Amino acid sequence: MGEKGESVAVIGAGLVGCLAALAFAKKGYEVSLFDYRSDPRLATTTDRNLRSINLAISARGIEGLKAVDDELAARVLRDMLPMHGRMIHNLAGKQEPQEYGLFGESVNSIDRGVLNNALLDEVSAQEHIQAQFGHKLVKANFNHGATQQLLFAVEGKTVQLEFDFVVGCDGAYSTTRQQMQRFDRMDFSQEYMDCFYLELYIPPTPEFSERFGGPFAISPQHLHIWPRHNFMLIALPNKDGSFTSTFFGPWSLLDRLDTREQLAAFLTTNFADAMELIGLDNAIRAFQENTKGALMCVECRPYHLPGGKAILLGDAAHAMVPFYGQGMNCGFEDVRVLMGLLDDYAGDRTAAFAKYTASRHRDLVSIIQLAKNNYRDMSHNVVSSWHRAKRSLNNVLGRTFRGTWLPLYTMVSFRADIPYHKAVEVDRRQAAILSLVQSALLSLAALGGFKGLLLLYRWIKQVRRV
């Protein structure tokens, strides 16, 4: 538990910042939550720079919420829609489902703004959290005796405040992180991916669809992908029957899409069925008028300052591209892991923060790399016959040797008890086995039935011990 009167400043009232504020308040700390933006729940608030890809919340994110409060998790997730797999749309418009889980597991689509506002409502209901919007962190002094001195810009003036410690949840361009670098030797790197994203919109249908159980034009139980090798379109369902659709492609592609005619030809050639849903004119207007977002990764280490003065969570510590759907899930897991360490060390921030950096780094590096790698999987491998056959075999082994063989996606998305780095290690070992299995299948099949299956099982166990 926090010491009586101990204060924490949480910088950033996004998803991770809100959950961190709720978690610290539950442990007895006096929490101040700051954000440079206006309160997004206000009707007058319009953020033209806010461009978000719909969220896919899975086991790690859900467990992060539950670790703070089971009932809170149920309340803030009431608007999510389960997606049981991908729906692949080929050039001809044919749709092919690909299940996510081995046994019917699903990831869940939820609107970022809806979830953020739900968490802010929870924050507002807490006696020990004070949320202050329109406060932009300008400077921090982490050598100010027993407290940390923060300078905020507020309505053209500066305000100086002091806290026992600081939690930076202010995103990829974190000011908290920049200020921490002034006081410790923090390694830092950022990498822009040669890929932009652009949001599009599939409206709900005018009439209720009996087939889909609502005003949905396409299945709401799938994440839809139009993979076209070096570019792609995706769509995630919303509760109102609409879909948030996002186009991803290399920046150089824009050079070939200058005119309306070029855009029309490109979109109708590559996404004919999607244009029937979005509307060709709407898609062209979006390409011509909407801001294109950049995708970047951030890595740093350590994530904390000595003495328990400050720590980074979420994108401030590990921004990643969205192709594994783990950005928010990983950030919520950050909160759960940190709270567990504070329990383990009886509230000793110095020890808990140091252990967090030491134990969490491998996981964060692993998921950042997995997210980058998964772009090719979504845009290309999902239509590759070789990779589909390999994936099918992987899933067969997973179902046959339940609990012994786990596909990578299962470990990352549905097994919050398996750290990211451990999932990568297991996957590498299984990939080597899978390569041998593919070579051996014909000879094993000749043995037939149960005998072949038993031999395969014994052989896998033997290889896994190597």
UniProtKB/Swiss-Prot annotation:
Cell compartment(s), UniProt: Mitochondrion outer membrane
One GO MF term: kynurenine 3-monooxygenase activity
GO biological process per UniProt: 'de novo' NAD biosynthetic process from L-tryptophan; anthranilate metabolic process; kynurenine metabolic process; L-tryptophan catabolic process; quinolinate biosynthetic process
InterPro entries linked: FAD-bd (IPR002938), FAD/NAD-bd_sf (IPR036188), Kynurenine_monooxygenase (IPR027545)
Enzyme Commission code(s) on record: 1.14.13.9
Enzyme class, broadest EC rank: oxidoreductase
Chief location category: mitochondrion
Alphabetic keyword roster: FAD, Flavoprotein, Membrane, Mitochondrion, Mitochondrion outer membrane, Monooxygenase, NADP, Oxidoreductase, Pyridine nucleotide biosynthesis
Required co-factors: FAD
GO cellular component, as recorded: mitochondrial outer membrane; peroxisome
This protein's pathway: Cofactor biosynthesis; NAD(+) biosynthesis; quinolinate from L-kynurenine: step 1/3
Reactions catalysed: L-kynurenine + NADPH + O2 + H(+) = 3-hydroxy-L-kynurenine + NADP(+) + H2O
Its job: Catalyzes the hydroxylation of L-kynurenine (L-Kyn) to form 3-hydroxy-L-kynurenine (L-3OHKyn). Required for synthesis of quinolinic acid.
Similarity remark: Belongs to the aromatic-ring hydroxylase family. KMO subfamily.
Stated name of the protein: Kynurenine 3-monooxygenase
Taxonomic path: Eukaryota, Fungi, Dikarya, Ascomycota, Saccharomycotina
